[in-house]
């Protein structure tokens, strides 16, 4: 009986590997991200896929299998988008699934060049697979206006020690390391079975390389993150008004919204208060083109005794040729509206504008956008004047914190900290807010700047330069508090290697992938290669 079972397993190994690939890879991939946050799942989510790949399936099979797995996993991850659009959710999941398929086929090609039984045959393909994952993630940041939501590195936001090297390499390094570890573990499991009765059973260069790499990037900056020299920066009152999305643009609720902002803001008056922060587009009118709205906001800033950083629509131009912007303004006590303001640079396609509107006018009937919002042109910093110094606020609006380059540009301009004004009310009580917050953790570490996030509901809190959440409000309720923001004085006025040099590691991965393609056949045992 035992012999028959063993023979059945031997005869059906590839089918079992294929079944486990479908069952476990999407399950572990989804589980490693917020809101589930089983971050350890990121260490093994590709193991079933890598084991199945060892059976040399056809490229066609690899493409359709990985596309289906990617589509399934991403449908679950962005299911919250159905609150806005079912069709958009399904289509977007398919697009990201296609990126996963692109990576899978490229990886299969790498391994096809290293067939045989050489001890080192899997090293180059494993490195190449990790490099290709970074390349595809980077492409996802730019193709079709970009959707870099949940890079693999975002799975580790609850383990900041793993992320610290992002200040040098960008968060790409963590994605690289996790994919390399997955293939190292898979190689070790395959070797345990394939070399069960030989001395080579415990010898697995891929696994040792991956483990060494993980340890290196985790501990290379441990001393820096543990030797912090924190100093008080400023006190910020944060307002989370929890305005239902169906009320935000309904003029019948205008007075109610303004009254909410008043009674949430005014009680925060204190001699030690330095600033008040409101979420994205919280005001019902464009503040820079509305005299009564400006007067109201100025009275409120004067009443609380601190400048208010307010998310609101901005408007420029003359009647009949108005230009609309999604902006962050500063309203000062007594003085009123500060003339400079930040406008969102990376807009949401089909949410804030219709791409190539003139080519498909029928799209206006599908997407109810009367006019396009225009993008801002630069990372306009706003001053925060304190008693003995002045800070510079780098603003990011909505999902702009998912784009590493926007945070980098603000810090290169001299931002002392990053302010993310957002609104997750579109997506209901879902995992969207927790997923969104994960990107702010990555931006904080990459730039070594504190990140203050203020949402209409969702997640409001602040994150230090090392990715640790220092304080936060409960989500999906109306709330307000005062955060005492501190900073590590060692990074004041300084730029990280990543801020200075950008995505240099991505270009290194392009070189590494090409190199691995070239050397993959070299370590194959020519006597056993097929």
Where in this protein do the model-derived segments appear?
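Membrane-embedded alpha-helical bundles of multi-pass enzymes
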Residues: 2-224, 429, 443, 455-466, ...
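Soluble catalytic domains of enzymes that build or remodel membrane lipids, polysaccharides, and related
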Residues: 224-501
């Amino acid at each position: 009986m035992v012999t028959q079972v063993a023979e059945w397993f031997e005869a059906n190994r590839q089918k079992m590997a294929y079944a486990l690939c479908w069952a476990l890879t999407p399950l572990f991939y989804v589980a490693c991200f917020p809101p589930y946050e089983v971050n350890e799942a990121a260490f093994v989510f590709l193991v079933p896929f890598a084991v199945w790949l060892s059976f040399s399936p056809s490229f066609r099979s690899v493409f359709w299998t990985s596309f289906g797995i990617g589509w399934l996993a991403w449908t679950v991850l962005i299911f919250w988008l159905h609150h806005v659009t079912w069709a958009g959710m399904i289509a977007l999941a398919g697009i990201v699934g296609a990126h996963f398929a692109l990576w899978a086929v490229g990886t299969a090609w790498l391994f096809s060049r290293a067939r045989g039984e050489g001890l080192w045959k899997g090293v180059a393909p494993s490195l190449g697979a990790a490099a290709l994952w970074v390349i595809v993630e980077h492409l996802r940041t730019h193709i079709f206006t970009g959707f870099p939501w949940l890079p693999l590195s975002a799975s580790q936001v609850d383990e900041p020690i793993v992320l610290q090297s992002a200040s040098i390499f960008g968060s790409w390094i963590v994605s690289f390391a996790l994919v390399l570890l997955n293939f190292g573990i898979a190689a070790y499991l395959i070797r345990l079975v394939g070399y069960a009765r030989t001395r080579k059973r415990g010898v697995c260069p891929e696994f040792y390389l991956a483990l060494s790499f993980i340890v290196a990037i985790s501990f290379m900056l441990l001393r820096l993150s543990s030797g912090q020299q924190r100093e008080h920066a400023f006190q910020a009152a944060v307002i989370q008004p929890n305005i239902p999305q169906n009320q935000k643009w309904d003029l019948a609720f205008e007075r109610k919204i303004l009254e909410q902002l008043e009674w949430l803001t005014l009680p925060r008056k204190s001699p030690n208060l330095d600033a008040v922060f409101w979420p994205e587009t919280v005001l019902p009118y464009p503040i820079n083109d509305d005299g009564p709205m400006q007067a109201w906001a100025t009275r409120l800033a004067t009443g609380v005794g601190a400048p208010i950083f307010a998310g609101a629509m901005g408007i420029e131009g003359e009647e009949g040729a108005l230009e609309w912007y999604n902006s962050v303004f500063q309203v000062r006590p007594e003085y009123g509206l500060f003339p400079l303001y930040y406008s969102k640079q990376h807009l949401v396609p089909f949410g804030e504008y219709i791409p190539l509107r003139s080519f498909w006018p029928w799209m206006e009937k599908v997407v109810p956008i009367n006019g396009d919002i225009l993008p801002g042109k630069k990372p306009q910093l706003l001053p925060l004047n304190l008693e003995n110094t002045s800070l510079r606020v780098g603003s990011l609006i909505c999902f702009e914190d998912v784009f590493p380059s926007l945070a980098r540009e603000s810090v290169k301009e001299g931002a002392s900290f990053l302010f993310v004004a957002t609104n997750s009310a579109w997506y209901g009580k879902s995992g969207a807010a927790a997923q969104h917050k994960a990107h702010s953790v990555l931006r904080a570490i990459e730039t070594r700047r504190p990140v203050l996030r203020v949402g209409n509901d969702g997640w409001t809190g602040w994150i230090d330069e090392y990715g640790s959440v220092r304080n936060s409000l409960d989500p999906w309720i109306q709330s307000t508090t005062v955060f005492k923001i501190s900073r590590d004085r060692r990074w004041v006025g300084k730029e990280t290697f990543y801020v200075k040099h950008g995505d240099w590691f991505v270009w290194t991965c392009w070189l590494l992938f090409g190199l691995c393609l070239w050397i993959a056949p070299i370590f194959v045992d020519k006597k056993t290669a097929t």
